[in-house]
Amino acid sequence: MGDALVSCQGCGKDVVTKLACPKCVQLGIPNNYFCNQECFRSNYKEHCKIHTAMQQLLLQQQQQQSGDGVVAAMDAPKAEKEALPVWAQHYRFRGSLRPTMLSPKRSVPAHIRKPDYASHPEGHSLSEQRDRANNTSIRIYKTPKEIEGIKHACQMGREVLNEASKALRVGVTTDEIDRVVHEASIERDCYPSPLNYYKFPKSVCTSVNEVICHGIPDYREVQDGDIVNLDVTVYNREGYHGDLNETFCVGNVDDAGRKLVQTAFQCLAKAVSMVKPGTLYRDLGTVIHKTAQANQCSVVRTYCGHGIGSLFHTAPNIPHYHKNKAKGIMKPGHVFTIEPMINLGGYADVTWDDNWTAVTSDGKRSAQFEHTMLVTETGYELLTARANEPVMTWNEENYTRKN
């Protein structure tokens, strides 16, 4: 009996000779064939979506059989949880960090106020899209109610980051940090802003070593000598976001790593000291660049600080590098973040095929600090400051987590 004609999953042509996808065979996915090796390779990235969907389906079936989905996933064999995701199995990594599988998405109680993207199937913020289309000016927050609402969000964000940093140690997984952030946010009647924002799958960004930003929490355990950035944003019951991040040295970090973290802190501190009415937003990048360069570091150009408040991201756009063309002059009532990402090597970055994790192109380490601030009549107010630290002051002990 001759082989029946089937369609190539790459080009769609009818084929008789069946080149089966080995991963589909492993997962039990039928009738997934290609006409030749070249077609298979050129279409593999898109084809992997089928693998991901099947893996999620299998996981859901396992969870239903166990009667408790989250517990079942957490109790899965360690080797299974730490396996490489499908997209990573043929990916050319730039450094030593590797991703693992992800835990199930955490749920948010119905009573928590949520931003518009929380329920959007693709995580789109329609309010941000309308803002970009219709508004080119920087919003000024004037009323006491608005300002108190933003201050509350920033205070809640600070408390959540403090809780997360207490849990950070050698051997803890970044997924556990995500659990702490998620639960601490809910306890404060806040929504963890990263969750489902353009489909980001977790409640906090955890960026380790060569990861510049947007690292996704997973089952990898934090290692002795890692530097780990925790980026927390919460959305409060008043409808405002508060955003901050800090980088920590975990265990025995070498001199270069500790100096990098301190340099990133100093870059932010120098920029914050310039905040006052009349300062050009573009000038922040100049002082950040000079500080980084003086310490033999570089400044990432792809990602910027941003306006924040009722929207997660809005005007102004604040590049951290010199000779940028940022528009705008600071005025009382402006609320925004500054968040320079500082690298030990070159400034170039690439994004993993998870579509989120930004890493250094040369695999060298990166560090970052971020605050949300309000421009006042005479200067600024650091809304996400540590307790009793209205002005940024370096204290290495604050950013060190021993074994």
Give the positions of each predicted feature.
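Cys/His/Pro-rich metal-binding microdomains
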Residues: Q9, P22, Y33-F40
